[in-house]
Every structure is written in structure tokens, then in C-alpha cells.
Amino acid sequence: NQETRNGQRIRRGLTKHKAVDGYIRRFCTSDQSENNFIYYVLGKKERHTLADYVTGVEETSTNKIVLYSSAQTGKTTELKQLCWELQQSGLYLPVSFEVRTNTKLKRDDLPESQYVDGREVVLVIDALDEVNGQKYEDLLEEIGGYAYEHPEMKMVLSCRSNFRRERQLELFTELFLEELSIDDARDYAAKREVNSDRFMRSVFANQLEDFIKNPFFLSVLIDAYKGK
């Protein structure tokens, strides 16, 4: 599965992306502090999606992004949705890799050209934290070296927050995947044809409010609520 332009070849990472079933819209921030969420609640801060940052709707200091969040909070889903949205735009060509199936990824495996058939390549590498020890260090060295050699290339990585490596990824802008807000949970409940006010009252009555911050658990709660 290869695409070429002017003799430049993409060796690996091309796939036909699909929309994520039951996707819940997520937002990212470059500010990990509590103040960021407070400003949003007060209506003083706009929220931005990962695609906003990648495509330049929201400016960043670099064209390379590493997305951090805790384990099992939706990073892989977010990158899959990003690839789908980029593909659907017709302007971008997402080239994606999952580290768990590419533990020995080398820079020679990665795209050589910024554009293919008029579309801008976006290199997406999911779950750097799937490997550890020397394999992790080797992977970071390959990715960091590739980023240095290709300043023009848009790149998006994902990684658990406790695996942060500022020095090896100094060319990357750090973004953090936000937890779902109460309004996000309400909106998704309504989308699932649930009375959002009653659902939220049930959540708080049963002290389950921490679970609605995570898309997976929110979906499970709504399934349980609908089946009660």
C-alpha cells in the first residue's frame, strides 16, 4: 500500500481510516494547570480540538505535537478520530503507526516527502509508552532524529503523562487531553437520547461524578442507565 509523488515513496503506515463509532468530542490544552479549566467554566477560554492544533486553526510554536494524558483515557481513540478527520478533509494524508505493533520503528520506515498527490502528510505515532526500557529510549532517538531531519513534517505522538521526556522531544509542543466536563457529559447523554438532567441527577446521587470525566466510563454509565 504505497503512494508516490516525484519519486518519493511512503513505505508504511497508509491505511483507510474510519470514523470512530460513538466518538465523544474531546479537547486539548497546552496548559495543564487547574486555572485552564476554571477559565473555560467562566467562559473566558475557548476550547480547541487536536485537529485545530494540527491544522493550524489554533497556533502552536511548532508543527510537531505530543499528546499526553493518563492511561486508558482515550488517546488512541483521539488519534484515530484525528486521522479520520484529516483524511476526510482531502487536504491531508495521515500516515499512522501503533507502537505496540511497531516496537522497532526506524526513521527509514517514515515518510520522506511533505506532500503526496497534493496532500500534506501528517505522521501520527500512537502510544509511545507501549514499550519501555532500552526499546523506549531507542524509539525516542529514532523519532527525535527524524523530527530534527524533517522540520517541515507535521507530526503527532501520544504518550502517557508519566512517560514524559522533554529533552528527547524538545522539538514537540506538549498538549494535554482534557477530561470531559459536566457539560460534555450532558451533551453526550442527550445525543444518546437520554434525559440529561435526570441522568446527571442519578450520577451525583450515586457519587459517580468522577466516572463521567472518562469517555469509556461515561458510555458504560449511559448504557446502564438506559437499561435500568
Predicted feature residues:
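P-loop NTPase signaling cores
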Residues: 4-228
